[in-house]
Amino acid sequence: QSLIRNEMAVQNYLELAIWYYSIGQVGRAEKVLSMSPGDAETAYWRAYLSQDRELLEKADVSDVSFVFPFREESVPVFEWAMKESGNWRSAYLLALVHYSRNNDAEALELLRKQGREPDFAPFYITRASLEPDKTLQEADYRRAVALDGAEWRYAHALTRFYMRHSENRKALSVIEEFSRRKRNHFPTETLLVRALICNEEYGAA
């Protein structure tokens, strides 16, 4: 354990645990994961290996921020969790696995089924990036901004969405409001200038 000190230690533990599981050493896989710093994916794996309801409940309230699963081996783990509890987190993480493998249709189907339940802005940004329907895409970008109005990337995503669809007044409204709350932020000021130019407000730009 003391030898695993890199910044991706969680992945090292998970990789080793999955290897043990693949050769039928479930107990050793569980032991490895019990020593891991852990994240949401690890939490679901621990619940899956032990078939423990209490561990599943803990996984269902874990933080999924900066968790990006990509392993095919995790697919049955998340599918099991979805069947057992139906929490949106397991569906979201499963969608990310599909997304990482360019299975966009499968990812979008999973995300659509979660509706408006998730209170996690990146969920809506991810779904918007896959959603072909303009109305639904706009709703997801707006939901992300509503959930985390301090994060500049979400305000920028909504602004760029409006600009792509030539809704320049809406784009300007979004980025102007955000720029008043985040002054002297170079990416925001740059996007504000672009929005002003798109609205032919050259003097203000």
Predicted segments with their positions:
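A conserved position within tetratricopeptide repeats
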Residues: 3-4, 30-37, 60, 82, ...
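TPR alpha-solenoid repeat register
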Residues: 12, 42, 90-91, 123-124, ...
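Alpha-helical adaptor scaffolds
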Residues: 65-67, 120-132, 156-164, 175-176
